[in-house]
């Protein structure tokens, strides 16, 4: 139905929050100290920054809108190795996104997101536990174009949103060689996100044909099982070795799987009807690669790439960053 493109705001907001927690997870999973050594003068402090780009697409199904979202942004974070077992920290992220959608109408706009991330990792012998809490807020703009006969009209909207997510991951270390330089980690991951895009009224040449859009709220949980394979590769002149990583997961969603909004014409905003976005597949195959290369005695340059593939939807993202050990 005309107007279904407004649902792209809510579902893209949710997907962006889930991507964000995945990026933080990739960093936190590599934190902590090497248990093979004696560590004195703790705590140890670290700071890192990274730039990230992503592309996500949800296929349109008839009059049920999908979306395409391209984002770019960055994260600054700090973490502390409090003792041999426990690491904690925080990070701030700003992402800027370009959003398009097509169904019975077409739409384009911006979806900018800002996140505060708190995280902790605990290592006990071969078991590791990881917890991430992320809160976010959003600024969004969307311009819809509706064609009729030989003409068209445009309707402009702007709004804000917020969201919260939590993620827990459990992993077990299996050494694949005698010096433990190659580690296989079977893992279990559970997460939940809840988002809200505030309602708004459109303006522009649409006049009374513009829409009053009510709040869009989504809550989705996911459980995943998979494995992470990491290994040391080469070393620099200071004896510090590079770390390579491959990740694969199968993830299952529960809860909301499509965007939905109640809308009414400005001519009679008391009468509303629901419009729906395309439904996304609940089972995903997720894969990622990472490489951390030491620089000097205290720095590390890292790169990451990730993909999420499921029925009707796919996304890819990559990041590059620098980490400094004080």
Task: Say what each PLM segment does.
Residues 1-59:
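Interface/linker segment at the passenger-translocator junction
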Residues 1-3, 42-326:
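Membrane translocator/pore-forming domains, dominated by Gram-negative outer-membrane beta-barrels
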């Amino acid at each position: 139905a005309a107007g279904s493109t407004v649902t792209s705001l809510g579902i893209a907001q949710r997907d962006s929050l889930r991507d964000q927690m995945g990026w933080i997870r990739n960093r936190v999973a590599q934190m902590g100290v090497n248990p093979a050594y004696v560590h004195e003068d703790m705590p140890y402090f670290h700071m890192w920054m990274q730039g990230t780009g992503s592309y996500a697409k949800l296929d349109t199904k008839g009059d049920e809108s999908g979306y395409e979202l391209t984002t770019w942004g960055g994260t600054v974070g700090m973490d502390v190795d409090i003792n041999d077992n426990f690491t904690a920290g925080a990070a701030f992220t700003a992402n800027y996104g370009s959003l398009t959608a097509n169904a019975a109408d077409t739409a384009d706009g911006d979806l900018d997101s800002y996140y505060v991330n708190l995280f902790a990792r605990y290592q006990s012998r071969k078991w590791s536990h990881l917890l991430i809490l992320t809160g976010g807020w959003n600024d969004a703009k969307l311009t819809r174009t509706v064609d009729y006969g030989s003409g068209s009209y445009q309707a402009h909207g702007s709004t804000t949103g917020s969201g919260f997510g939590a993620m827990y991951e459990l992993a077990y270390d299996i050494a694949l060689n005698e010096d433990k330089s190659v580690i296989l980690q079977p893992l279990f991951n559970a997460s939940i996100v809840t988002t809200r895009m505030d309602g708004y009224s459109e303006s522009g040449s649409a006049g009374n044909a513009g829409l009053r859009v009510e709040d869009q709220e989504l809550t989705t949980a996911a459980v995943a099982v998979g494995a992470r394979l990491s290994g040391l590769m080469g070393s620099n002149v200071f004896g510090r070795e590079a770390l390579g990583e491959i990740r694969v997961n199968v993830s299952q969603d529960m809860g909301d799987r499509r965007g939905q909004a109640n809308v009414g014409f400005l001519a009679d905003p008391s009468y509303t009807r629901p419009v729906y976005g395309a439904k996304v597949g609940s089972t995903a195959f997720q894969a990622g690669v990472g490489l951390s290369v030491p620089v000097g005695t205290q720095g590390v340059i890292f790169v990451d790439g990730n993909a999420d593939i499921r029925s009707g939807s796919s996304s890819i993202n990559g990041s590059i960053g620098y980490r400094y050990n004080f």
